[in-house]
Amino acid sequence: MCGIIGYVGADEVVPVILDGLRRLEYRGYDSAGMAVLAPDTIQILRAEGKLRNLEQLAYHHPLHGTTGVGHTRWATHGAPTEANAHPQIDTNGEIAVVHNGILENYASLRRELLDDGVELSSDTDTELIAQLLGREDGPLGDRVIKILPRLVGQYAVVAVSRSEPDTVVAFRQGPPLVVGLGTGENIVASDVTAILHRTRNVIYLQNGEIAVVRADRVELLRVDGTTVDRSPETLDWDAGRVEKGGYRHFMLKEIFEQPDAIRNTVLAYLDQDRQGVNLDGLGFSSEELARLRRVHLVACGTSWHACLVGKFVIEELTGLPTEVDYASEYRYREPLIGEDVLVVGVTQSGETADTLAAMEMAGAGGALLATVCNVRGSSAWRLATSHMLTPVSYTH
C-alpha cells in the first residue's frame, strides 16, 4: 500500500512532506516523490529507491512553498522508475496527483486518451487521473466531481492545481484517507501515523467523498456535489504509540510490547472485581445473540493467523461452529449468510480492503457484523454494530 501526505498551511511544506513520508515508510515502497506549489507552477521531485534519495534530491534542488503533496509508491501499473513515480502531472502542468490503488478500466482510459492525441509520459494509471482532471474546467473540486463516474476500481487520490495554490483536494473509493485539522493548517494522509504529531483532530473520509482542504477550512462533498456535515473526531492516542520508542524497528517494539498488549486487551473487558467478563457494551441485543448458529471470522495476513486460534476458543466457549476465511476469498465461495450468522472482521487498521469488502457483503446478507480492530472510527469500526477495540500500541 502506498503512502500519501498532503499539506496546506503556513509552514514550508517540504519538511512536512518528508517527515510524513518517513512515518509511512513501514508500508514498503520502491520510489518516492513530492509536488510543491509555487506561483504559477508546480515543482516536482521524484526518485527511485529509498526515501533518502528523495531527501538528497530535495537538499540539492530545494523547493519552497506552503502547499504540496508527497507519496511513496509500491509499483502496480508500470515499473518502479522515476518516470512512473508519483506525483504524476497532466500535459499542461496544471494538475499533480498522488494515488494509492488500481484503476480497473486503465486500458480503456489509456486508449481513449492516446486516441485523443494526449501524450502520456508514464505507464501508470495515476497519470490518467491527472490527465482527466487537466481536461476539465473549473475549480479542482468541481473537476473531481466531473471525472469520478469515469474511474472504475479502488483508489485514494490527493491532487493539487497550480491555479489554486492554497488548496489540496482528496477523494477515495476503497483505500483510506484521513484529514487532520490543525491551527492555520490542515493535512491529508493515508494513515494517521503521518499526522498524529501535528494534530489529534481528524475526519476519516468515507467512500465516495471528496475533501476540499484549505489552511483555514475543510469542505466535504458527495459525488453529486452536495455538502457533507460531519464533526471531527479527537484521537486519544499517546503520540508515542506511533513512534519506535528507542527500538531499532517497529517489529522489535511490537514483540516486546506483547505482554502488555495482551494484558491491556483482557483488562478492558473484565468486571471491576476481575471475576468475570463484561461484554454488555458490544452492541447486540440478547435476542440477536440467542439466535446465532454460526460464526465466521474474516481477515488477512497475521490477523487471519489470530483467527485460527480464535476459532478454537469460540467453539470451546460457545459451542457455535466457527469458520475462518481469508477475506479475499470469502466473497467468492458463496458462504451461507443470514440473521443467525455473526461475521467478525479482524483488521488492525480497520481499513484492510478485502476484509471491508467481506464485511459489506455479509452485512448485505443480513449477518450481524462485529470487528476486532485497533483504530476507533476506522472503516471497519463504522461498518460493524459491535466493536472490540484492542487498546494496544499502534502496529505496523
Regions found by a protein language model. Name each.
Residues 129, 331-347, 353-354, 363:
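N-terminal small/polar loop signature for handling phosphorylated ligands or for N-terminal nucleophile
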Residues 176, 263, 267-269, 273-276, ...:
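Anionic-ligand anchoring segments at beta-strand to alpha-helix junctions in alpha/beta enzyme folds, i.e.
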Residues 395-396:
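Conserved small/polar residues in nucleotide/adenosyl-binding loops
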Residues 128, 152-153, 195, 281, ...:
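Short acidic loop-to-helix transition motifs that present clustered carboxylates
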Residues 376-384:
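Glycine-rich, charge-decorated loop segments at or immediately adjacent to ligand/cofactor-binding or catalytic sites
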Residues 303-309, 351-358, 380:
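Short glycine/serine/threonine-rich phosphate/pyrophosphate-binding segments
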Residues 20-24, 173-176, 204, 310-316, ...:
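Short, solvent-exposed amphipathic alpha-helical segments in soluble enzyme
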Residues 1-249, 253, 257, 263-296:
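Conserved short alpha-helical segments that host acidic/polar catalytic motifs at enzyme active sites
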